[in-house]
Curated annotation (Swiss-Prot):
It is an enzyme of class 1 (oxidoreductase). The gene is GLUD2. GO terms for cellular component: mitochondrial matrix; mitochondrion. This is Glutamate dehydrogenase 2, mitochondrial. Belongs to the Glu/Leu/Phe/Val dehydrogenases family. Coiled coil: none annotated. One of its GO terms (molecular function) is glutamate dehydrogenase (NAD+) activity. CDD domains: NAD_bind_1_Glu_DH. It comes from the Eukaryota. Its EC number is 1.4.1.3. Its main location: mitochondrion. It comes from Pan troglodytes. The active site is at 183. GO terms for biological process: glutamate catabolic process. Homohexamer.
Length: 558
């Protein structure tokens, strides 16, 4: 076991900095004034050093316990924010009583509240019987319903679903989505089952969750995750609505990520990848951060590598490519490909759909080494947890690590990246696009109307009336003999003049959510002199928000 010392949290080595105001801002990010050298210690170290939340951090080896990993990151954030939480309490208590209250609530937040472990039989198409194992973890009910995906994988375990559920709690808090965290897993390899068998498994798993009170529009709302998608979510919604929810008008809000015909929402499939893009965008366009990394702001001419070509990896690659970045390598479980001149995401997607693999793609070469160690500007781990470890972290050459996956970086690797001035954009912020748009879908299901349906024509007519009013006013003032002065909208305005579609509203709301949350993280990082430690800043924000709910609701019956 090891302890993160406060000094490591509150200081950071300075990298190359640009001249002018950007350099001064960078110095502030690194916890010192303009023109001052990096200090050996920072104000507040004496207080932070005696805090004890970081005692239970993950093991030192390369394969730490996943749930302990998340708890360790939580402890880092808690050790930073404890004094502020005590100071902000508005109760008639002594300093010691306030501190005890704060520590008590933090202990309430940290553990996983409920874990359901179940098994059930299915009859396979060949007549044989098989027992299927599954889990659903609910980390926190400070907000309900709980929210989190369902994954199908042979690697599913109790530890994994607990860790992912806890990440969901903090993720929702970071982006101000009013859900508690949850996660489910079914221990199968879906490639080994027919569609009929997968439908049996999905529907039976739904019934088992329903019998135990682990699914429902106001209780617990699953979503797609690894190896699940619209098809499985549709089966879940239909099963719930046809059985336990048959009297519930909101039954289809029991799950998100559904097809449009089943109450889904436009923009949900690409939401996580689009959120990854917006998350990177908010930091790569910030000159103060880029000066620390020795990079110029913007995506243009930046190179990136994607590990994992699933839903998240594909859509992240699409959006970065669209805005001028160049993908030079893509890795999957069966191999990796590389082309220093760039890989087109549409061509690669079409090839994989046709051949079932990335290998053999004619416009790239097979890559035998570790894709995580390729020299690039941005590395996007979008596969599974614990990919960046103490062993390979020193060899990572990317300047920005954008965590599209959940938990891809171990605590030891995270520490190494901080020491090397590598900017890690953390998972609990960066891949929150999926749950954000799931929230929009859930609201759509409860409201029983699609976004824009009630205002679409009104907005269109209002826009045209506005343009006609301007045109007529100009003609009366400046027109000769009643001549026309046509008002010609710009291309951008012309695209939106007819009114916002559901997809437009979803994309705009997602971009705003990611921008607002990024600003909150930047502000917290500067406030606590965290340097490039955005992960701790994000956890601090999440802890403050969850703490506020518990504190103001009262904890007598918690």
């Amino acid at each position: 076991m090891y302890r993160y010392l406060a000094k490591a949290l509150l200081t950071s080595r300075a990298g190359p900095a640009a001249l002018g105001s950007a350099a001064n801002h960078s110095a502030a990010l690194l916890g010192r004034g303009p023109g001052q050298p990096a200090a050996a210690s920072q104000p507040g170290l004496a207080l932070a050093a005696r805090r004890h939340y970081s005692e239970l951090v993950a093991d030192r080896e390369d394969d730490p316990n996943f749930f302990k990993m998340v708890e360790g990151f939580f402890d880092r954030g808690a050790s930073i924010v404890e004094d502020k939480l005590v100071k902000d309490l508005r109760t008639q208590e002594s300093e010691e009583q306030k501190r005890n209250r704060v520590r008590g609530i933090l202990r309430i937040i940290k553990p996983c509240n409920h874990v359901l472990s179940l098994s059930f039989p299915i009859r396979r198409d060949d007549g044989s019987w098989e027992v299927i194992e599954g889990y659903r973890a609910q980390h926190s009910q400070h907000r309900t319903p709980c929210k989190g995906g369902i994954r199908y994988s042979t690697d599913v375990s109790v530890d994994e679903v607990k860790a992912l559920a806890s990440l969901m709690t903090y993720k929702c808090a970071v982006v101000d989505v009013p859900f508690g965290g949850a996660k489910a897993g079914v221990k199968i390899n879906p490639k080994n089952y027919t569609e009929n068998e997968l439908e049996k498994i999905t529907r039976r798993f739904t019934m088992e969750l329903a019998k135990k009170g682990f699914i429902g529009p106001g209780v617990d709302v699953p979503a797609p995750d690894m190896n699940t998608g619209e098809r499985e979510m549709s089966w879940i919604a239909d099963t719930y609505a046809s059985t336990i929810g048959h009297y519930d008008i909101n039954a289809h809000a029991c799950v998100t990520g559904k097809p449009i015909s089943q109450g889904g929402i436009h923009g949900r499939i690409s939401a996580t990848g689009r959120g990854v893009f917006h998350g990177i965008e908010n930091f790569i366009n910030e000159a103060s951060y880029m000066s620390i990394l020795g990079m110029t702001p913007g995506f243009r001419d930046k190179t990136f590598v994607v590990q994992g070509f699933g839903n998240v990896g594909l859509h992240s690659m699409r959006y970065l490519h669209r805005f001028g970045a160049k993908c030079i390598a893509v890795g999957e479980s069966d191999g990796s490909i590389w082309n220093p001149d760039g890989i087109d995401p549409k061509e690669l997607e079409d090839f994989r759909l046709q051949h079932g693999s990335l290998l053999g793609f004619p416009k790239a070469k097979p890559y035998e080494g570790s894709i995580l160690e390729i020299d690039c500007d941005i590395l996007i781990p979008a596969a599974t947890e614990k990919q960046l470890t103490k062993s390979n972290a020193p060899r990572v050459k990317a300047k920005i690590i954008a965590e599209g996956a959940n938990g891809p970086t171990t605590p030891e690797a995270d520490k190494i990246f901080l020491e090397r001035n590598i900017l890690v954009i953390p998972d609990l912020y960066l891949n929150a696009g999926g749950v954000t748009v799931s929230y929009f879908e859930w609201l759509k299901n409860l409201n029983h109307v699609s976004y824009g349906r009630l205002t679409f024509k009104y907005e269109r007519d209002s826009n045209y009336h506005l343009l006609m009013s301007v045109q007529e006013s100009l003609e009366r003032k400046f027109g000769k003999h009643g001549g026309t002065i046509p008002i010609v909208p710009t291309a951008e305005f012309q695209d939106s003049i007819s009114g916002a579609s559901e997809k437009d509203i979803v994309h705009s709301a997602l971009a705003y959510t990611m921008e607002r949350s990024a600003r909150q993280i930047m502000h917290t990082a500067m406030k606590y002199n965290l340097g490039l430690d955005l992960r701790t800043a994000a956890y601090v924000n999440a802890i403050e928000k969850v703490f506020k709910v518990y504190s103001e609701a009262g904890v007598t019956f918690t």
